Amino acid sequence: MKFPKIYYVLLLSFLLGAERGAELRTRERVLYGKFEARFKPTQGEGLVSSFFIYNDDFPNSDWNEIDIEILGRFPQVVDLNAMSPGSHLRTHYVPFNIHLDYYEYGFEWTPDYVAWFI
């Protein structure tokens, strides 16, 4: 799976009512690499914790994104996605409550594949 150059963006979480989060941008474009973050996902209805990179040139080019998303209402579900035209979202189940502790999340992006890890 090949993606155009992207900006590195990190969004940690939104807290209901307080809407707090973080985003990190670079002026440099990156293409391939290993991306990691250590965080404790937010738990609760309507909350999302995520770690992702995406192409910031939309709509001038196709939307491309690699992400890890954790919905606060599902304690054992993680969405690991490589989104581009024609791609699909992937839901994965883990054998533990993901909201109870800090874990290291990441993905390795190469010219040939994207691999995720927790």
Language-model features: locations:
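Sec-dependent N-terminal signal peptides
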Residues: P4-F14
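GH16 jelly-roll
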Residues: G17-I118
